[in-house]
Amino acid sequence: MSSRKRLLRWAGGIMIVLGAGHLSLLALAAWEDIAGWAERGMWAAVPLALTDGGAVQTAESLQNKVTFWAGPGSFAVPLILLGCLTWHLAGRGVAVPAGIGWALATWCVLGGVLLVPSPFFAGIISGALIILAARKEDRSRAARDPGDGPAVIRARRRR
């Protein structure tokens, strides 16, 4: 297995574990709310309240919204999907763009700073691994075509 593939597989695995762990912990911590959705129907998770804005929200409705936005409405599901996509692309030998790694790392730094302590900081590792894998792709491409310098490689990317 190439080192680029290994880096991307680790990045994807970390993202999948973080997202699945987030959803699992939420299921353990807020099982009553989630079971209530099943009893009342999924539309009851975050009901649409068509009022003039003067309605007072109950503690139960606020807890429902918090549970929804901390679970299925959070970034855990897209993080799992991104992890699966990264894993799949690594298996096919397709490089994930470094911009994805930079965006993921930036998002995790911001989330980790705003919500300390949290596992957000573990997501920085995934972002860094994606960036490293993209750089290995650039270096291997330059090694295959020694007449092309970094400027030519960047120009090819823009096409």
Predicted segments, located by residue:
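Short, intrinsically disordered terminal tails adjacent to the first/last structured region
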Residues: 1, 141-159
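Juxtamembrane non-transmembrane "cap" segments at the membrane-aqueous interface
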Residues: 33-46
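Juxtamembrane membrane-water interface segments that cap and precede transmembrane helices
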Residues: 49-66
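Membrane-interface capping segments at transmembrane-helix boundaries
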Residues: 91-92, 135-145
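Mid-chain, well-packed structural core segment of small domains
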Residues: 66-98
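N-terminal signal-anchor transmembrane alpha helix
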Residues: 7-36
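Hydrophobic alpha-helical transmembrane segments of integral membrane proteins
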Residues: 90-130
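Membrane-water interface of alpha-helical transmembrane segments
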Residues: 2-12, 62-65, 69, 94-101
